[in-house]
């Protein structure tokens, strides 16, 4: 079904200086050019010139992917593949845009015929980084079915919650998770179709590999309005049960062009590798829409578990030009001897998900000669702020607002605050709601309404803007610590902690105190070399280090060493769980 092609290194194609923007997408780029560093040498002028027109009808598969197929056939695109997959066994697979189109149309016919799905039906997709995950994404676009990704780390309880809350009609997964689905399927009244990606058959499941052998690649893409729901993403659940975030064909299908063009700086000649788990919106950001709207190659490595040396070897062996990974990954990579690897093709590195500490970016730059361009966004949005090529990077800053959004710091009444004052990070949505923003939380109107304050969508994050227009993250609104009249964000304290050689990871929360009301408490995971040290002495050393690194009133008056931090399935620290533990006796 999925033909394996022989291994050989990609020939570097000369970068196109111009990118034709097809049909309904043309309004995205006023000058029809891909991003270049000089775009942001004059940030204000660039942002002012940015224009967007949203067409009434838009479907990413038809209006972008199929158009790249036409460019490819006409020889008007570099010879990069659309998709390049490898695994640890040395197997490789590459598809052109034409092959991607043919295979995804077969998959679309399976959804419509074998699964009896109709436009608007909901499809939960739980697969690791296998080629079928990308085909399923495009097949859902072609059929107008609503994609709902999930991570392979979900438990049986998690799967039940997602099936029931989303009212999913179909689930696509592998033989590892199929037993968990079968165990809860009888409790999910809307579920009527199950597809398995496996070499083996399973009772009650359609086998995708077998169905693909007989499916037709003749399929007419549905005509979707730009504001139809395209996908539902579950949030990571850092402050409670995961919410269902609805995105339209335009909010991600068009909105993520801002990411691809400006933040990722992609052209049709680029090979982009994003290491995000397939269950999260970040994979939609950087493994589907952002690279493909620019005609770039999506590269992926099916690593069953995180292996720093495998990542470094892959960056060295393959012609990857743009690399995107989480701050935790970069932190682990810089602990290795990077200088023994040569990244001959790599030219641009980005990170998102959580703030990246300045010490990590400095180590990466010293070892590779490359900056890490941090970006800030949410499941609910495309890129909100970013450090863009051609712009001065301020280490630790989220950068400046993306061209898509008017971002401000606002107070509790929705008034805009001046530079230097901490407040809530908001995106202006009135009088004109920007593209690239979710529509609502599914079946949760009260939560949707709570995100609006005056003319702004409130992100739930605290921050401030400096005099140069750069935004700085302080904390999730509910993570801020109030001690003796001071407002303390955990991120700056964690930054200071993580710079101490004994600290592998840390999380900072509030802890009750009879005099100050609450104080800063640090939960610290020690590096192996320090686990045998005298803990009382080590606590004093760490506290003194923080006092010297940041404002003394922010130092953790309480320190507890733990084996590991509690984290969400997406790898984000669950500070709320640590905070509840501290306050449970009050």
From Swiss-Prot:
Example GO molecular function: fatty acid ligase activity
GO biological process, one term: acyl-CoA metabolic process
Cross-referenced PROSITE patterns: AMP_BINDING (PS00455)
Signal peptide (from-to): none
One Pfam family named in its UniProt record: AMP-binding
Keyword annotations: Acetylation, ATP-binding, Fatty acid metabolism, Ligase, Lipid metabolism, Magnesium, Metal-binding, Mitochondrion, Nucleotide-binding, Transit peptide
UniProt-listed InterPro entries: AMP-bd_C, AMP-bd_C_sf, AMP-binding_CS, AMP-dep_synth/lig_dom, ANL_N_sf, Mitochondrial_ACSM
Subcellular locations according to the entry: Mitochondrion; Mitochondrion matrix
Cofactor(s) essential for the protein: Mg(2+); Mn(2+)
Chief localisation class: mitochondrion
GO CC terms: mitochondrial matrix; mitochondrion
Residue positions where N6-acetyllysine is found in the record: 157
Annotated positions of the N6-succinyllysine modification: 73, 106
SUPFAM superfamilies documented for this protein: Acetyl-CoA synthetase-like
Mitochondrion recorded as keyword: yes
Reactions mediated catalytically: a medium-chain fatty acid + ATP + CoA = a medium-chain fatty acyl-CoA + AMP + diphosphate; propanoate + ATP + CoA = propanoyl-CoA + AMP + diphosphate; butanoate + ATP + CoA = butanoyl-CoA + AMP + diphosphate; 2-methylpropanoate + ATP + CoA = 2-methylpropanoyl-CoA + AMP + diphosphate
Transit peptide: 1-27
Keyword Translocase: no
EC numbers for this chain: 6.2.1.2, 6.2.1.17
Positions with a binding annotation for ATP: 235-243, 374-379, 461, 476, 572
Its job: Catalyzes the activation of fatty acids by CoA to produce an acyl-CoA, the first step in fatty acid metabolism. Capable of activating medium-chain fatty acids with a preference for isobutyrate among fatty acids with 2-6 carbon atoms.
Protein family membership: Belongs to the ATP-dependent AMP-binding enzyme family.
Protein name: Acyl-coenzyme A synthetase ACSM3, mitochondrial
Species in which this protein is naturally found: Homo sapiens
Lineage: Eukaryota, Metazoa, Chordata, Craniata, Vertebrata
Gene expressing this chain: ACSM3
């Amino acid at each position: 079904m999925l033909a394996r092609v022989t291994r050989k290194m990609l020939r570097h194609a000369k970068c196109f200086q111009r990118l034709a923007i097809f049909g309904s997408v043309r309004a995205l780029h006023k000058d029809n050019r891909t991003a270049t560093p000089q775009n942001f040498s004059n940030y204000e002028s660039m942002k002012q010139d940015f224009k967007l027109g949203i067409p009434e009808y838009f479907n990413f598969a038809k209006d972008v992917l199929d158009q790249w197929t036409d460019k490819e056939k006409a020889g008007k695109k570099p010879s990069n593949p659309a998709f390049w997959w490898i695994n640890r066994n040395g197997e490789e697979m590459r598809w052109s845009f034409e092959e991607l189109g043919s295979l995804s149309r077969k998959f679309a016919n399976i959804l419509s015929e074998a699964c009896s799905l109709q436009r608007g039906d909901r499809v939960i997709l739980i697969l690791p980084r296998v080629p079928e995950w990308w085909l399923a994404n495009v097949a859902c676009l072609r059929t107008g079915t609503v994609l709902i990704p999930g991570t392979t780390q979900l438990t049986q309880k998690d799967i039940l919650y997602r099936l029931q809350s989303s009212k999913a009609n179909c689930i696509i997964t592998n033989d590892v998770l199929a037993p968990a689905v079968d165990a809860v399927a009888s409790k999910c009244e809307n579920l009527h179709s199950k597809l398995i990606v496996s070499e083996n058959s399973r009772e009650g499941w359609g086998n995708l590999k077998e169905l693909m052998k007989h499916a037709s690649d003749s399929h007419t893409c549905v005509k979707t309005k730009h504001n139809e729901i395209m996908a539902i993403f579950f949030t990571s659940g850092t402050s409670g049960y995961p919410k269902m975030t609805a995105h339209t064909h335009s909010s991600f299908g068009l909105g993520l062009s801002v990411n691809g063009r400006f933040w990722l700086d992609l052209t049709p000649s680029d090979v982009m590798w994003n290491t995000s788990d397939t269950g999260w919106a970040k994979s939609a950001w950087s493994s589907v829409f952002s690279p493909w709207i620019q005609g770039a190659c999506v590269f992926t490595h099916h690593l069953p578990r995180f292996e720093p040396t495998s990542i470094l070897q892959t960056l060295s062996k393959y012609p990857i030009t743009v690399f995107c990974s989480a701050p935790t990954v970069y932190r682990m990579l810089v602990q290795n001897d990077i200088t023994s690897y040569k990244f001959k093709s790599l030219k641009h590195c980005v990170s998102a998900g959580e703030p990246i500490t300045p010490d990590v970016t400095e180590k990466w730059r010293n070892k590779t000669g490359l900056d890490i361009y941090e970006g800030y966004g949410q499941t609910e949005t495309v890129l909100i702020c970013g450090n863009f090529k051609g712009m001065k990077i301020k280490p630790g800053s989220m950068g400046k607002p993306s061209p898509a959004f008017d971002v401000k710091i606002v107070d509790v009444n929705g008034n805009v605050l001046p530079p230097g004052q901490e407040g809530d990070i908001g995106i202006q949505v009135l009088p004109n709601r920007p593209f690239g923003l979710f529509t609502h939380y599914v079946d949760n109107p009260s939560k949707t309404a709570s995100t609006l304050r005056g003319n702004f969508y409130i992100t739930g994050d605290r921050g401030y803007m400096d005099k140069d227009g750069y935004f700085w993250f302080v904390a999730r609104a509910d993570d801020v610590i109030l001690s003796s009249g001071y407002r303390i964000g955990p991120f700056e304290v964690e930054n200071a902690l993580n710079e101490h050689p004994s600290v592998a990871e840390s999380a900072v929360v509030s802890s009750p105190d009879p005099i100050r009301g609450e104080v800063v408490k640090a939960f610290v995971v020690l590096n192996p070399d320090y686990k045998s040290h005298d803990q009382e002495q080590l606590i004093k050393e760490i506290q003194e280090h923080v006092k010297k690194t940041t404002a003394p009133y922010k130092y953790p008056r309480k320190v507890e060493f733990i084996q590991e931090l509690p984290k969400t399935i997406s790898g984000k620290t669950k500070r709320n769980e640590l905070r509840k533990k501290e306050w449970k006796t009050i």
